């Protein structure tokens, strides 16, 4: 996520898995979107110091809080499992908090789904199309950015369960051409600790994507942008959110699965998980019905409709599409390991520090103060899908913009405010992005990608390169 402050409109506006672009503000943001493709680790996904200025007293922040301002005396307390009962009063507080974030951030529309043992919450706010004023609706399809990484990681782990690959095998045993591949393991790629330079931080990539959002990239072309740079760190030594890792894992899935990555993920993950509204696109077409997505990752920095931009630049790091109901279901399936052997899921859940307090990253998922899952951001869209195991509760949200608010991913702000009310002892929190996300806007691939620290760029990353990152 870029920390650069961008002009905001007075009216709501609606991904950016890749995140900011190069030196010019518009390009910088565009690059961020591509890199973002992260989701939850939006702050971590940034790779560089923030050059933007934040308001002295922002009304909304993503800072952790023991209690939300809207969760005061007289409100029901969290039960032993960590979530509050969804009483009419709590529901009203959630409505008010979501409306407040929607208004203050200028997000066009958002879908929010919550499932707890004591009740459910499924509501839409704002508009799905700023031109027609069509209301946002839970049935609509939106791009999910870096949530895609959770599907790619699951596909790899299905191959582990089938005995076709080992997590500690060198990637060179399966994928040719990876610099230093003999010393980089499959596990390190999934944990964002390969040390490779992220392709979505390369200025040439960012410029190509921002100036031609319908450009069709091949996986090898994407990786080539990163491979021309030296490694950022030795394998296994530091966390750096990096879309390149998940493009390489996509190639591994194709090699061992014997099918195009999207087809394998559909057959081995989407279908077994019974996600009837989730898909891996092969072009820029959106399945109907869908919400339009809005971004400022453009050459001029002007807001544009990114709905049908080609997601090939994000591929297995952030190209997928889903609905809020499917994300609710997927968050539980992913966090509980329903598609994997228990021992394999246990390996996936071994999270390591990211540099952000309370946030650890495992094999294609994070633990954010107890919430297990991921976030995503790419030009036009952002998402969060997380599960709180001890409370058997799920939170999923989707919004149709990736435009940052005072340096923060709007999806993180919604999740933060919601969990302050829903689970005050487990508040979802990601610091504002420092400069540019480490993945193109996406998600997902939104959200989260740290460098040497979760919010800063690795010391070895060229300073001129950090702002030219696209989020995913």
Task: Label every model-predicted segment.
Residues 103, 176-179, 254:
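Alpha-solenoid HEAT/Armadillo repeat architecture
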Residues 46-123, 266-267, 307-472:
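Catalytic loop of the DD-peptidase/beta-lactamase superfamily, centered on the K-T-G motif
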Residues 90, 94, 148-151, 245, ...:
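Hydrophobic/aromatic residues within well-ordered alpha-helical segments
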Residues 122, 184-371, 375-379:
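Short, surface-exposed loop or secondary-structure junction motifs
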Residues 125-127, 296, 399:
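Active-site donor-binding loop signature of nucleotide-sugar glycosyltransferases
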Residues 1-51, 58-61, 65:
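Secretory targeting and sorting signals
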Residues 98-99, 112, 118-120, 141-168, ...:
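Active-site SXXK
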Residues 88, 116, 125, 129-241:
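Active-site-proximal loop and beta-strand segments within enzyme catalytic domains
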